[in-house]
Each structure stands twice: as structure tokens, then as C-alpha cells.
């Protein structure tokens, strides 16, 4: 299925030094630009954040200080990135809560007027959350890989809730 677009849309993702929008910095940005007639263009920039990359961030994305030491600083490529995305709507996964605010903050630091007023933002995570069932049965199937027998009996739901917590707790703690 193709998207029925009236204007380009840029799917993008950021890798960063952390998750604090006001404090952390971008270390990589990748953009997939889809044009109304289906043409696809992709660009990826490695970015020198000008601050050390914490080891916990490197553990997530694999980008080290050594890897970015000769990469351009964000302020050196901000205008190029903006020129590439300015005529497009934006899409990402968790982009409304993280990627767009982080990109806007970096653009602000670089002195680039990043205006979202005339853009549509599509957060695929929000769509996923709206489309995917958010029930105890769905959580039980996801975390425990079992079907919930006797759903909506208090005892079965109580036991399933306990098992979901145990299974998700293991995932959180590992």
C-alpha cells in the first residue's frame, strides 16, 4: 500500500546523548523523505555533539566519542537538514514526545527557525497504541505468550496481572 500524499513526508529518527531534550544532544539523524509520487530519498548524518557521549547512551546506539570526533557539529549542518525537511510533514516513532522537541531544541541552539506551524506530525507510536488492544488479555499474550483463560473472572485477572508484572519486570530489570 502506498501513502496518498499531497506533500512530502519525512520519516526520521534521532540517536542522542540522552533523553533530556534541553540538555542532551543529537549524535545521529536519519531522514527518509517520501514524495507524493512515491520517490524516496534518504540521508543520514553523524553529528559531533560537542559533549562526551555517556556510556549508557553508547550501550543503546553504539555511537562512541571516537566515531563522532571528526563528524560535523549540529550547528554546521542544521541549515542543510532544515532545507531538506522544510517542505515536508514529519513522522517518527515517539516523535511527538521526543524526536521533534529534540530536533527543535537543536535547531534553536543553531539559530535555525524550525517552524512546525504548517506541518503535520505523524507519531507512529501513537497510532500503534490506538490500534493495538490495550487489555489485560493483550498484555498477557504479549508478556507471557499465553492466552488468558477465564478473562474477567477476578481470580484469573488477578493471577494474570501478577504474571504480566513478573514478566515485564524481568524485561525492565535486564
Q: What residue ranges belong to the model's regions?
A:
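A short, structured active-site edge motif that brings together acidic residues
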Residues: 116-128
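Short, charged, surface-exposed loops that flank catalytic or proteolytic processing sites
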Residues: 151-154, 174
Amino acid at each position: 500500500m502506498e501513502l496518498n500524499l499531497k506533500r512530502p513526508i519525512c520519516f526520521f529518527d534521532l540517536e542522542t546523548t540522552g533523553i533530556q531534550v534541553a540538555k542532551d544532544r543529537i549524535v545521529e539523524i536519519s531522514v527518509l523523505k517520501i514524495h507524493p509520487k512515491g520517490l524516496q530519498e534518504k540521508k543520514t548524518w553523524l553529528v559531533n555533539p560537542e559533549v562526551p557521549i555517556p556510556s549508557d547512551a553508547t550501550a543503546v546506539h553504539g555511537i562512541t566519542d571516537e566515531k563522532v570526533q571528526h563528524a560535523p557539529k549540529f550547528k554546521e549542518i542544521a541549515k542543510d537538514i532544515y532545507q531538506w525537511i522544510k517542505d515536508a510533514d514529519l513522522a517518527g516513532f515517539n516523535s511527538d514526545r521526543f524526536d521533534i522537541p529534540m530536533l527543535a531544541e537543536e535547531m534553536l541552539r543553531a539559530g535555525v527557525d524550525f517552524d512546525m506551524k504548517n506541518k503535520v506530525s505523524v507519531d507512529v507510536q501513537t497510532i500503534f497504541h490506538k490500534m493495538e488492544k490495550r487489555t489485560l488479555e493483550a498484555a498477557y499474550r504479549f508478556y507471557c505468550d499465553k492466552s488468558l483463560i477465564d478473562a474477567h473472572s477476578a481470580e484469573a485477572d488477578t493471577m494474570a496481572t501478577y504474571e504480566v508484572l513478573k514478566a515485564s519486570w524481568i524485561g525492565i530489570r535486564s
